[in-house]
């Protein structure tokens, strides 16, 4: 990548506007992968029945930030004491309806290191590779994420359960900003301390809802999710976006061992994310 290129402030501002939801998606990737594939006490993730090569989960979200996200598991390694390794490939398309234009398309490849030796499970992805394309700029770089807490609702969700503890997700990312027209780096985007906090979760009684497998008795799990990106270094500019707060409901179906729907309320708008395909 060419070094010493001048940073054009107008371009950086344009990149910031266009990618305003991108860092939050990065910081929350583990939330989607963990919460929608099912969060739990130590021991459970590495022995989950759906954890094998070829498992695929596809999500479809509506609202002002429509998205299609597909997770694929590969190269599972259980030959590790008190843990396992998981290859995770993510392909996503998302965008802001108000901006129009080409959606943001991202490809992520992570190697998840799962440690189940402690009281809570810990999952770490170091320098996961990311490539993102949008109409005005591409991002090429890495993201690292550390997650501690629950990862399988099934293991901690007894029939009489009414509450579950919260979780935290810490991320950092480092990207070159590339001009699609010129094919060269025009800037750099760095965040050292992005964080997602999930409050204590309230569990409701089972309700029958439509799912990809037909009507199922599923339990609503409600909580507040706060995403903080910290200080972003965008070229020569320093940006500190305000934290974003969302009220989330996960619909977990015990018979399927998966969250089939997630409802996210933010700024008076509700986005519904459904599992539309599950192969395991």
What are these regions (language model features)?
Residues 23-35:
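Bacterial N-terminal signal peptides
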Residues 19-21, 26, 157, 204:
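Hydrophobic alpha-helical context, especially transmembrane and signal-peptide helices
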Residues 37-42:
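Boundary at the C-terminal end of the N-terminal hydrophobic targeting segment
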Residues 1-18:
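N-terminal secretory signal peptides that target proteins for export/translocation
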Residues 123-193:
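Extracellular-facing segments of soluble proteins and assemblies that are Gly/Ser/Thr-biased and enriched
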Residues 8-10, 21, 25, 73, ...:
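N-terminal compositionally biased, intrinsically disordered segments and leader/signal-like regions
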């Amino acid at each position: 990548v060419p070094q010493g290129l001048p940073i054009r402030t107008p371009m950086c501002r344009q990149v910031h506007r266009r990618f305003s939801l991108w860092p939050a998606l990065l910081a929350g990737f583990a939330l989607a992968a963990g919460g929608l594939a099912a969060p739990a006490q130590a021991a459970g993730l590495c022995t989950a029945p759906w954890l094998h090569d070829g498992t695929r989960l596809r999500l479809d979200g509506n609202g002002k930030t429509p998205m299609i996200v597909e997770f694929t598991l590969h190269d599972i390694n259980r030959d590790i004491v008190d843990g396992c390794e998981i290859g995770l490939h993510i392909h996503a398309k998302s965008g802001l309806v108000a901006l129009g234009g080409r959606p943001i398309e991202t490809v992520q490849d992570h190697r998840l290191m799962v440690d189940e030796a402690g009281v809570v499970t810990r999952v770490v992805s170091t320098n996961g590779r990311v490539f993102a394309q949008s109409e005005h700029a591409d991002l090429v770089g890495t993201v690292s994420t550390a997650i501690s807490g629950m990862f399988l609702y099934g293991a901690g969700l007894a029939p009489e359960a009414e509450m579950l503890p919260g979780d935290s997700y810490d991320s950092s990312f480092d990207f070159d900003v590339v001009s699609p027209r010129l094919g060269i780096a025009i800037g750099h985007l760095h965040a050292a301390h992005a964080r997602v906090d999930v409050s204590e979760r309230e569990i409701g009684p089972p309700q029958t809802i439509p799912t990809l497998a037909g009507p199922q008795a599923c339990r609503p799990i409600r909580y507040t999710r706060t995403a903080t990106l910290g200080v972003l270094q965008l070229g020569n500019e320093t940006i500190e976006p305000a934290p974003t707060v969302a009220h989330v409901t996960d619909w977990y179906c015990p018979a399927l061992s998966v969250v089939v729907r997630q409802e996210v309320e933010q700024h008076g708008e509700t986005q519904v994310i459904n599992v539309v395909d599950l192969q395991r």
